[in-house]
């Protein structure tokens, strides 16, 4: 074999590389062994995962339930459930056997009592008394046992009822301190409706009584000069009805229809469909005085104040429309005006007659 002939530094380098290579091979072998061990640990036996049906520890009922391959968790769960059933059966069997033993002991006691020798009548009486006492004691014992069983059953029933009550959903109740006036309430709405109807009826009845009241009106037939008259009529009388009755007082107007007559109050021409009640209710005023007063009086004052409205009331005028058309450019008919289309606006301070209010202000 040929030898490498070189410098000492090259030889050292070769030896270092060989050692490094050996170390790497060792590390690779260690990793391979570690992987093999991990694979072995992850592999489970079929007996660990499943258990055969022919296991001697399981009973016949569990063998019937575990047909075929069953996971070990299911297998153990089935065994636990079966053991619980067996325990409950054993407890019931013990109770029954105890009851049977007690009954047998009672029967044996009765037999012993009957087999006792009867030496005298007193002994018989005593024996009968003892037998009766024993029987009573035995009956009391049976009754006590039955009562205890009934108590246990009742306690179990009460526990079940309490559990059911706890499982029920608890709903929140209403808070009586909360204001619920904004919520719809049929009863409250019906009461409010009845109250409104009652108040409306009372108001209408009151207005009808006011309309039926009589008052005196001073008027004149105006044809350039006044022919004054006075008449009594109800407050609900319309202007048309008043003109129909008033024209009969004058010979000149007996042949004139109501449609050709005009009614003027305080320089305002009032339509025929209005009533005196409307004029009084509106508290309106005309150009020279109030429209709701139909008597005649003058407001005489020592000091005239232009800021305070006068209380003078003038007589109403009844005029033929033909005369008005001919003389409407002459005083006083030149001052007359038709009532506005909106009628008596009580919110209009220019038309509303408020003497007392203005006196209070000034």
Curated annotation (Swiss-Prot):
<dbReference type="GO" id="GO:0006325">
    <property type="term" value="P:chromatin organization"/>
</dbReference>
<feature type="compositionally biased region" description="Low complexity">
    <location>
        <begin position="83"/>
        <end position="93"/>
    </location>
</feature>
<feature type="region of interest" description="Disordered">
    <location>
        <begin position="80"/>
        <end position="103"/>
    </location>
</feature>
<dbReference type="GO" id="GO:0005634">
    <property type="term" value="C:nucleus"/>
</dbReference>
<dbReference type="InterPro" id="IPR048337">
    <property type="entry name" value="FAM50A/XAP5_C"/>
</dbReference>
<dbReference type="Pfam" id="PF04921">
    <property type="entry name" value="XAP5"/>
</dbReference>
<comment type="similarity">
    <text>Belongs to the FAM50 family.</text>
</comment>
<dbReference type="InterPro" id="IPR007005">
    <property type="entry name" value="XAP5"/>
</dbReference>
<feature type="compositionally biased region" description="Acidic residues">
    <location>
        <begin position="122"/>
        <end position="147"/>
    </location>
</feature>
<protein>
    <recommendedName>
        <fullName>Protein FAM50 homolog</fullName>
    </recommendedName>
</protein>
<feature type="region of interest" description="Disordered">
    <location>
        <begin position="118"/>
        <end position="174"/>
    </location>
</feature>
């Amino acid at each position: 074999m040929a030898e490498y002939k070189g410098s000492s530094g090259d030889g050292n380098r070769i030896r270092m590389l060989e050692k490094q290579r050996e170390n790497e091979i060792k590390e690779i072998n260690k990793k391979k062994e570690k992987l093999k061990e991990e694979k072995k640990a992850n592999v489970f036996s079929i007996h660990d995962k499943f258990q055969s049906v022919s296991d001697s520890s399981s009973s016949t009922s569990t063998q019937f339930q575990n047909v075929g391959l069953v996971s070990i968790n299911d297998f153990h769960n089935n065994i636990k459930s079966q053991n619980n059933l067996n325990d409950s059966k054993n407890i019931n069997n013990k109770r029954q056997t105890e009851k049977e033993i007690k009954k047998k002991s009672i029967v044996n006691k009765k037999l012993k009592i009957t087999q006792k020798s009867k030496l005298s009548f007193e002994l018989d009486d005593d024996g009968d008394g003892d037998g009766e006492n024993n029987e009573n004691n035995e009956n009391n014992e049976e009754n006590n046992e039955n009562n205890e069983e009934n108590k246990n059953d009742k306690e179990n029933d009460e526990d079940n009822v309490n559990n059911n009550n706890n499982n029920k959903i608890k709903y929140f109740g209403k808070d009586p301190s909360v204001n619920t006036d904004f919520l719809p309430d049929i009863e409250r709405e019906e009461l409010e409706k009845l109250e409104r109807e009652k108040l409306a009826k009372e108001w209408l009845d009151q207005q009808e009584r006011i309309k039926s009241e009589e008052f005196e009106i001073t008027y004149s037939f105006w044809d350039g000069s006044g022919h004054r008259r006075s008449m009594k009529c109800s407050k609900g009388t319309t202007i048309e009805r008043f003109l129909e009755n008033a024209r009969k007082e004058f010979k000149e107007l007996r042949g004139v229809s109501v449609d050709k007559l005009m009614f003027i109050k305080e320089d305002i021409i009032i339509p025929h469909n209005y009533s005196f009640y409307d004029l009084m209710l509106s508290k309106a005023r005309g150009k020279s005085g109030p429209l709701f007063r139909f008597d005649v009086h003058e407001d005489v004052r020592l000091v005239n104040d232009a800021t305070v409205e006068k209380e003078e009331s003038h007589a109403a005028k009844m005029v033929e429309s033909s005369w008005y058309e001919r003389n409407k450019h002459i005083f006083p008919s030149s001052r007359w005006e038709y009532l506005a289309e909106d009628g008596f606006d009580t919110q209009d301070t220019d038309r509303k007659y408020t003497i007392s209010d203005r006196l209070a202000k000034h």
